[in-house]
Amino acid sequence: MLCQNCNINEATIHLYTSVNGQKKQIDLCQNCYQIMKSGGQEALFGAGNASNGNSDEPFNPFNDIFSALHGQDFNGAASTQTPPTQTGGRGPRGPQNPRAKQPKGMLEEFGINITESARRGEIDPVIGRDEEIKRVIEILNRRTKNNPVLIGEPGVGKTAVVEGLAQKIVDGDVPQKLQNKEVIRLDVVSLVQGTGIRGQFEERMQKLMDEIRKRNDVIMFIDEIHEIVGAGSAGDGNMDAGNILKPALARGELQLVGATTLNEYRIIEKDAALERRMQPVKVDEPSVDETITILRGIQARYEDYHHVKYTDEAIEAAAHLSNRYIQDRFLPDKAIDLLDESGSKKNLTLKFVDPEDINRRIADAETKKNEATQAEDFEKAAHFRDQITKLRELQNHEVSDDEIPVITEKDIEQIVEQKTHIPVGDLKEKEQTQLINLADDLKAHVIGQDEAVDKIAKAIRRSRVGLGKPNRPIGSFLFVGPTGVGKTELAKQLAKELFGSSESMIRFDMSEYMEKHSVAKLIGAPPGYVGYEEAGQLTERVRRNPYSLILLDEIEKAHPDVMHMFLQILEDGRLTDAQGRTVSFKDSLIIMTSNAGTGKVEASVGFGAAREGRTKSVLGQLGDFFSPEFMNRFDGIIEFSALSKENLLKIVDLMLDEVNEQIGRNDIHLSVTQAAKEKLVDLGYNPAMGARPLRRTIQENIEDSIADFYIEHPEYKELVADLIDDKIVISNQAQETAETTDEEVPAE
């Protein structure tokens, strides 16, 4: 067995100890053992200052072993071949090595000097936080309890306030009491790390506080200050970092600046004694205009880092688009993310040279040149010399101003599209054509509902132009009418026209939400109930895909509490789920369908019905099913009229196109004569049932006949459906053409 230190000599010394209840063994040779015995264990395994546990290498596995062995009698703890009996208790310490490395200060070891970073110009400019910085300075200028805590939502710029304070100290723009102060950010995780033995953390905290008292020029900054509550606690006592700091915080011996979020500040509020020693400073989210100012202040830093240029339009777009489309984050953080990510994406288009690859190629060329020179092949040596010159020029090449890429508003829009799946850029490019042709495109697929299509197209135009409220959904409509007239079909086609795919539609059948507790299915279960950790079906899907159409079928079947929940969505475009997250519906289109009230006016449905009177009658019946405040929040209540025979003839063509699309997979094509179409309408016409009976009629008279004919004659691919003896018959196209030619009868 070789020595674990030098890995050369044979290990003749075996040391045993117990660390954290586990038995550890070190195998050393005689020389290495003498070095450790004399106190020079820093030479072994790079252990550093093992006696106090503050090693430069905190993850060294031998630190705790050396700490445990340091207090033992080495003469009794080692033997040449047989393991000694483990000794309890601590003996006197061995002589210290005078050449041992002196430990760094606690603040230097566990902290980062923000003031020094400000002197070197390494922090970004702090813009628009003068009031918060002024408030922090006022609290720090107090005699006691001079410990400000910055609280605010994630990403609003709490840490930037502390950096602004450090910059003001460097500039001398602070009161006399704060002159020459040093703002040092303390890493609580590193402070707790390596304190596995009871009492080590308390000793380390005491040394830290003693050092701060001696220096008397330290303002300690703890990010995520709620971590000090319970930090270092053994679990069976209250001796954590928060309790250790309480006396010093109350007497003003220690100046502390903290930062935490609103939710996590509640952890500190639970400890009233700790909370009273701190003075909260609220950091609010900046406005869009303030965010633009902040972005312009840090613009140069990101341009230098990414080697790009930002246009003024890109800066403004980053603020406006992030505020409009990114809902889960806060300004200015989400706007800075757009700036940074767009710069990163554009930076990848630059053709930078890998320095390591160039150095490797230069070294290879140097070697080959020397070999050619020694071989007196001077022509080849000259070739490698020229190659080295070109490589060095390439190594020193810098991107000129003309080659620097420029980030425009279009680049910012692309980043927003990637993050939110909302086609921001396409909205502007295709908006005019889409809005002009929206009604015609919908009428091509939804037959007989021209009035309803025109109303919804006008409402969407108003919303797109910006005449609607900014926080309301794109549109909210209630489709009312008898069954089978195209209410759901219009919603599908609308999703396809607006969002490019009918899959963007989020559909709910409200017959599944007839119970009071079914509200939890939409927004999530309340705390304490099964399924609390799971997200709601509605809120989660909208949060993941905010640009979508929400279809609520048969809304009158839903429980009243479910409809009450939609009052806030229709009015304010927002809803809070069971987890407390606010979900935005500003980019959603909400459509609800209902046939409520149509049963009482069926007698007036038909060819000669007075449409004006029927409309008033249906809308009047809705009051029996929906509350006035619910109906009053829609952008429009659209009634669908019953379908006429002429409408069904057009619908037959659409349904037959679907049949041809299905059988086209087998290379079959079907042609239907006009007489057969009229027969299908006669068989499937029912004013009270709409177009659904027509689908069943086509299935029975067309699809079944095609299946029978194709099974008997699989070689025929061109089929025709004609009316023969008042029956619809499927035959081969060529055969049908020959018969009609002989009889001189028109095909249709």
From Swiss-Prot:
Question: What's the domain of life for this entry?
Answer: Bacteria
Write down the SMART domains for this protein, in alphabetical order: AAA, ClpB_D2-small
Taxonomic lineage? Bacteria, Bacillati, Bacillota, Bacilli, Lactobacillales
Which signals induce this protein? By heat shock.
The name under which this protein is listed is: ATP-dependent Clp protease ATP-binding subunit ClpE
Q: Where is the UVR domain?
A: 359-394
Q: Where is this region: II?
A: 407-598
Organism of provenance: Lactococcus lactis subsp. lactis (strain IL1403)
Residue spans annotated as Zn fingers (C4-type) read 3-32
Cite a GO CC annotation: cytoplasm
Q: What task does this protein carry out? A: Could be necessary for degrading proteins generated by certain types of stress.
Q: Which UniProt keyword terms apply here?
A: ATP-binding, Chaperone, Metal-binding, Nucleotide-binding, Repeat, Stress response, Zinc, Zinc-finger
User: Where do the record's region annotations for I lie?
Assistant: 107-354
Any Pfam family from its record, for instance, is ClpB_D2-small
Family as reported in the entry's similarity comment: Belongs to the ClpA/ClpB family. ClpE subfamily.
Q: Where is this region: Disordered?
A: 74-105
Molecular functions per Gene Ontology: ATP binding; ATP hydrolysis activity; zinc ion binding
Which PANTHER family does this UniProt record tie to the protein? ATP-DEPENDENT CLP PROTEASE, ATP-DEPENDENT CLP PROTEASE, ATP-BINDING SUBUNIT CLPC
Q: Which InterPro entries match?
A: AAA+_ATPase (IPR003593), ATPase_AAA_core (IPR003959), Clp_ATPase_C (IPR019489), ClpA/B (IPR001270), ClpA/B_CS1 (IPR018368), ClpA/B_CS2 (IPR028299), ClpA/ClpB_AAA_lid (IPR041546), ClpA_ClpB (IPR050130)
Q: Which GO terms describe its biological process?
A: cellular response to heat
Binding positions (ATP): 152-159, 481-488
